[in-house]
Amino acid sequence: MTARKPTKPNLRPVRELTPTLQYRTIHGYRRAFRIAGSGPAILLIHGIGDNSTTWSSVQSTLAQRFTVIAPDLLGHGKSDKPRADYSVAAYANGMRDLLSVPDIERVTVIGHSLGGGVAMQFAYQFPQLVDRLILVGAGGVTKDVNFALRIASLPMGSEALALLRLPLVLPALQVFGRVAGAAIGSTGLGRDLPEMLRILEDLPEPTASSAFARTLRA
């Protein structure tokens, strides 16, 4: 009897959906968010000093099965950066208002860093809107705070961030980061350094650094 050849599985290519950037004006402030996919809703909330692009690859993958919304928090990314309330409660209210735009009734909330704190506050304030809560290195769960963030939150932190607008300061920090990263890469600070430098690259704009400092103090 001739042995039957194993059949090859019918593999289909994985389809990625590219998020589209949209804007909505809510309570007088322009909010930016990226949305992709269809199906049950997922809300991705980024960390302090970051923006929605940090979720790009995750959002495209999840969008194959879900409606995935990744906002730029107020004071971050392409959203407005006013002199406003940057507390987690205010951010949670902003997330509720943003979800009302596409008329989403319930959502799985995923938060990283500050976004984790916002996600927890959102679940506390609006439990009727939350299906699941997922935290990734969430702020407010432990007392650990990045050393650089501690410095930036001090009274002179805003002045220190303003130095990023001077010529050659940011390039010098980037060179220092590469050298220091090689030397202390196995330590907690070494692991955080590349992420911190990536965030600092977005802060030379005066409104961005001011919003960053206000968020830290909130």
Q: What are the residue ranges of the model-derived segments?
A:
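Glycine-rich His-Gly loop
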Residues: 44-47, 113, 138
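Conserved catalytic-core motifs of eukaryotic protein kinase domains, centered on the activation segment
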Residues: 54-56, 79-85, 144-147
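Conserved HGGG/HGGXW glycine-rich cap/lid loop of the alpha/beta-hydrolase fold
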Residues: 29-78
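Flexible "cap/lid" loop of the alpha/beta hydrolase fold
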Residues: 120, 124-125, 131-167
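Short, hydrophobic alpha-helix immediately C-terminal to the catalytic nucleophile
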Residues: 56, 96, 120-124
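Conserved alpha/beta-hydrolase catalytic His-Asp/Glu region
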Residues: 135, 146-149, 165-218
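Active-site loop/oxyanion-hole signature of alpha/beta-hydrolase fold enzymes
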Residues: 24-36, 70-114, 126
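Alpha/beta-hydrolase fold catalytic core
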Residues: 1-42, 63-66, 93, 97, ...
